[in-house]
Curated annotation (Swiss-Prot):
GO terms for cellular component: nucleus; phagophore assembly site. It comes from Gibberella zeae (strain ATCC MYA-4620 / CBS 123657 / FGSC 9075 / NRRL 31084 / PH-1) (Wheat head blight fungus). Disruption phenotype: Significantly decreases the radial growth of colonies under nutrient-rich conditions. Reduces strongly the production of deoxynivalenol (DON), an important virulence determinant. The lineage of its organism: Eukaryota, Fungi, Dikarya, Ascomycota, Pezizomycotina. The gene is ATG4. This is Cysteine protease ATG4. One of its GO terms (biological process) is protein transport.
Amino acid sequence: MERAMANVDLGPYRRIVQIFWDPEPTNDVVHDQPVWCLGRSYRLNGKKNIKADDHHPQTPPSVLKAETETQEAHDTAQPPNPPTNAPDTPPDSISSSFSSSLAYDDPVVDGGWPSGFISDFESKIWMTYRSEFEPIPRSTNPQATSALSLSMRLKSQLGDQSPFSSDSGWGCMIRSGQSMLANTIAMVRLGRGDWRRGESVEEECRLLKDFADDPRAPYSIHSFVRHGASACGKYPGEWFGPSATARCIQALTNSHESSIRVYSTGDGPDVYEDEFMQIAKPPGEDFHPTLVLVGTRLGIDKITPVYWEALIAALQMPQSESQGKYYQYITRTFSALTIRSGRPSSSHYFIGAQGSFLFYLDPHHTRVALPYHEDPIEYTSEEIASCHTPRLRRIHVREMDPSMLIGFLIQNEVDWQELKRNVKHVQGKSIIHITDRNAVLGGSSEGRESAIDEVETLSDDDTDTIHEA
């Protein structure tokens, strides 16, 4: 439903229509479950907001979650929580339970969500479809048309051979990739800490300038398409998959960005420490903040339940000004319209979690192109606001597409050691694996014996051309 609405110009009536057709999720204020945004926890009951590493420096986030909820249940004399190995499914947005109905007798401001969570969520940089940018020429290759999404092929067959001045209908994965990269850079430059909208405006404008919809911007839609065509076999107007997106992020960042580096695993879940360290800390150099990108598939049609716990726990990883590791991921999901037909649909950027629900930023909203200003201070408040949203969207983990690109930021060697420890202690089945070296390339027999059985490779050739953005 949300995807269909995003492509319809409702003008001043959009908000009214959304209330009935696409309502925002509401928080169960009685149960007051913690809600997480990239490693920070928020709740309503006045208790101190926590980070996953507060007072528990040696406790994995998933275990900490169970301990925290058990203690809170005891303190408030609430009925005990279900076992930690059971799926943690909170009440739906509209609950029929007696206690929940009492909670919604009176209107709840901002859906009952903690104000700190809303402020944190809104501060995340949100890249969406854009229109009216400098046209991107179509490919002259005869195979280019067949590689386009269905909607774009129909337009071509109806005689529309004009260059692309909008990425609506094909650029959602690129926009999600931009969101991931922009928020990673923001954390390094601005600090995860308590940075919120309206603070360090000039620095934020310098960051947004790099993502402007202009060929001069290093991380523009034009730059992604240009590198996709030259190095990934992607034609202009063709839907990108996780692998192509990761390769573009890595190449563009390593060419233009001095504050971070990028390590990509390619099409599998295995991270090799020797390869990672060659990028993050070459001999004789200090450690460089490094974004690790993992392309993986956690099931066939849906995410296998054994991965649920680890996937949700990933968004609870600790971070602060000094400890900057956090997880984020992009996946194709099923929207309300396509659940019934079972067709894979869209790319979304996930940054938060509550129980078994995950919160995401949706790129399927077309806005006027973000201009390129030589002087970043020239960005208007409206242009900056177009890169943020307080609009919450969430999906249950069981409804997510299993094909995804996972990203996490390692700021220093302490982060790296902690990540390795947490991966070993995660509940359920780990979504990534860390080994000392690539046994195949290094000629060593060492490595995980179960690696061959576990790996499901993720190839853009298998996944991209059948999807519409």
